[in-house]
Regions:
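Short glycine/threonine-rich loop/turn motifs
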Residues: 1-125
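Acidic, Ser/Thr-rich low-complexity intrinsically disordered segments
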Residues: 126-131
Length: 131
């Protein structure tokens, strides 16, 4: 396993991605990736890769993106990946690590049961309304 740290800038990240070794690339960014034109997805494209999926119907984990670069999967992790609680990133990583190909149908299937247990510091919407 190789860990590379770069500034949160498209070109620096793209350069590191081009040089990445291994069979899988995992990206953890300094801020939430909220759209396809954010730094991390742009860096994947600048390195010659593509983004196959942005977002997923699982919370926590909905800000994940999945791409590919030179035949390697690239997973852009949302902030919830730092939590020990089960989240959508766990579902994606476990499938990719096992060689399962994910497509739009695969992600749609994750929507069933996609609201995972919330962490205490971020109550579920129904708890907020009980106030």
């Amino acid at each position: 396993m190789e860990v590379v740290t770069t500034p949160h800038q498209t070109q620096e990240m793209a350069h590191a991605l081009k040089d990445a070794s291994g069979d899988l690339i995992l990206m953890l960014t300094s801020s939430a990736t909220s759209d396809l034109n954010d730094t991390a997805p742009k860096a994947v494209r600048a390195a010659g890769g593509n983004i196959e999926r942005f977002g997923m119907p699982v919370d926590p984990g909905n800000l994940l993106f999945l791409g590919a670069l030179t035949g390697k999967p690239v997973i852009g992790f949302p902030g919830c990946v730092r939590s020990p609680a089960l989240n959508g990133a766990d579902w994606v990583l476990s499938r990719i690590a096992c060689g399962v190909t994910l497509d739009d149908h695969s992600f749609a299937e994750m929507a069933i049961g996609g609201l995972l247990k919330e962490i205490p510091t971020r109550p579920q919407p129904r708890r907020r309304s009980e106030g």
